[in-house]
From Swiss-Prot:
Molecular function GO terms recorded: 2-succinyl-5-enolpyruvyl-6-hydroxy-3-cyclohexene-1-carboxylic-acid synthase activity; magnesium ion binding; manganese ion binding; thiamine pyrophosphate binding
UniProt family annotation: Belongs to the TPP enzyme family. MenD subfamily.
Protein name: 2-succinyl-5-enolpyruvyl-6-hydroxy-3-cyclohexene-1-carboxylate synthase
Cofactor binding, note field: Binds 1 thiamine pyrophosphate per subunit.
Gene it is expressed from: menD
Length: 556
């Protein structure tokens, strides 16, 4: 009997089972203990293979692939700290709903807690963050293949969102020629190998039902808050709110077109919040709200009813409103709850939104971070997509820009970390095949710098704009102690990215004005390669411009 051959047959069952649940993309890091999984994946023609040498980046690459494809994505890593590097992407997926299948190779039980190399306690290491965790036994023919495949099917068949951790111990030898070991064990699955259905098919969960009193509530004064959703859902939500005559407060990730732009500015005006107090119901569609003023209003508003509609399970309301938590696909929910044509009830807010946008436009000529955020809608590629980083840049775009309705926007706004942003953007581009504009800050780019290796392989033009404000300038917006702000919060690195781009053979530009930036973008969208654009700005201008606009709009 060949141990290495049976390891591979065991792994082949696991990988084939994944294909029955829509897994097409599989991300693989180098490693020896994961050899059975890697070779099984390589031999399965159903998979599109992605590789990366950094497991943390690999996890985020998978996250980006899952965001855009809307399908589960598998990841294969070796044992030890390689597994731990998947934690940030797993956490993000749990909060934003992407399906990640983590196949982590492991040492067999007799090598754990005895000083063996690269052997750590992997089962349960991700605590409650995976939706499902499976600790498989060492491969053995004493366990029927139908147990293995049905175990995988149960986890994936009941997976609505988030990650699945499948820990896979393998004993040595890991290498060797294939023989007939385990063939009869595999063949007991019969014609499953020629089928395309799961061995075990589980009925999907019930969706949220229609609210029977909707016909009553849609006649009231309502407010629509739009959080993270798909591009198609964004367009439908905008039309739905317009028909109802309800003001729509759209987040940067809502893709609604933000018909009342600059919400994070005008929500700081007492006239706006006073008018919103008249709302009898608030319907929030999608979660992960960005703007500080929006979050403050959301926490303080007291309508008769507060409904939150999102496909992700959980409470999703840090303000703990009295109301309803409705778990449903947003587009499906809108169909069940049609709008009735009514006249808009808000008068002040549309006027304030227009005045806020005019105040932003009046400042658009300076070459700075806030101005880039406002102008970003002018720089989007046709039939493309936008990936927005975290920290200051996403807040500036949320507050100062008006993105087109239905234009795809992606970001990691679950845990809102700055780790893995470039890797996630790479995954988003690969899954869509679309021209992609990604914008991040300098610290975010440094954090995931080796992901530039992933950006060498793109199928359409990708432009990465690194806004270099020399540190974490979001802390300029917070009451951090001035005496310690630079050393312990901003942490300026005084670096530029020309040599980093050169190391990975990526095109690089550092424009000095808007004309140079726009010329660079025109050229970049012509070729299916990556272009790194470093926009060096005055360190505090972005935060100061936002604060000045907030003060100005609050007194309108």
């Amino acid at each position: 009997m060949s141990v290495s051959a049976f390891n591979r047959r065991w792994a082949a069952v696991i990988l084939e089972a994944l294909t029955r649940h829509g897994v097409r993309h599989i991300c693989i890091a180098p490693g020896s203990r994961s050899t059975p999984l890697t070779l099984a994946a390589a031999e399965n023609s159903a998979f599109i293979h992605h590789t990366h040498f950094d497991e943390r980046g690999l996890g985020h690459l998978a996250l980006g692939l899952a965001k855009v494809s809307k399908q589960p994505v598998a990841v294969i890593v070796t044992s030890g700290t390689a597994v731990a590097n998947l934690y940030p992407a797993l956490i993000e997926a749990g909060l934003t709903g992407e399906k990640l299948i983590l196949l982590t190779a492991d040492r067999p039980p007799e090598l754990i807690d005895c000083g063996a190399n690269q052997a750590i306690r992997q089962p349960g290491m991700f605590a409650s963050h995976p939706t499902h965790s499976i600790s498989l036994p060492r491969p053995t023919q004493d366990i029927p293949a139908r147990w293995l495949v049905s175990t995988i099917d149960h986890a994936l068949g009941t997976l609505h969102a988030g990650g699945v951790h499948i820990n896979c111990p393998f004993a040595e030898p890991l290498y060797g020629e294939m023989d007939d070991t385990g063939i009869s064990w595999q063949q007991r699955l019969g014609d499953w190998w020629q089928d395309d259905k799961p061995w075990l098919r589980e009925a999907p969960r019930r969706e949220s039902e229609k609210q029977r009193d909707w016909f009553f509530w849609r006649q009231k004064r309502g407010v629509v808050v739009a959080g993270r959703m798909s591009a198609e859902e964004g367009k439908k939500v905008a039309l739905w709110a317009q028909t109802l005559g309800w003001p729509l407060i759209g987040d940067v990730l809502s893709q609604t077109g933000q018909p009342l732009p600059c919400a994070d500015l005008w929500l700081g005006n007492a006239k706006a919040t006073s008018e919103l107090q008249q709302a009898q119901i608030v319907v929030q569609l999608g979660s992960s709200l960005t703007g500080k003023r929006l979050l403050q209003w959301q926490a303080s508003c007291e309508p008769e009813e507060y409904w939150i509609v999102d496909d992700i399970e959980g409470r999703l309301d840090p303000a703990h409103h009295r109301g309803r938590r409705l778990i449903a696909n947003i587009a499906d929910w809108l169909e069940l709850h049609p709008a009735e044509k009514r006249q808009p009830w808000c008068v002040e807010i549309p006027r304030l939104a227009e005045q806020a946008m005019q105040a932003v436009i009046a400042r658009r000529d300076a070459f700075g971070e806030a101005q880039l955020a406002h102008r970003i809608s002018d720089y989007l590629p046709e039939q493309g997509q936008l990936f927005v980083g975290n920290s200051l840049v996403v807040r500036l775009i949320d507050a100062l820009s008006q993105l087109p309705a239905g234009y795809p926007v992606y970001s990691n706004r679950g845990a809102s970390g700055i780790d893995g942003l470039l890797s996630t953007a790479a995954g988003a581009q690969r899954a869509s095949g679309k021209p992609t504009l990604a914008i991040v800050g300098d610290l975010s780019a440094l954090y995931d710098l080796n992901a530039l290796a992933l950006l060498r392989q793109v199928s359409a033009p990708l432009v990465l704009i690194v806004v270099n404000n020399n540190g974490g300038q979001i802390f300029s917006l917070l009451p951090t102690p001035k005496s310690e702000r630079e050393r312990f919060y901003l942490m300026p690195q005084n670096v530029h990215f020309e040599h980093a781009a050169a190391m990975f053979e990526l095109k690089y530009h550092r424009p000095q004005n808007w004309q140079e930036l726009e010329t660079t973008l025109v050229d970049a969208w012509r070729t299916p390669t990556t272009t790194v654009i470093e926009m060096v700005v005055n360190d505090t201008d972005g935060a100061q411009t936002l604060q000045q606009l907030l003060a100005q709009v609050s007194h309108l």
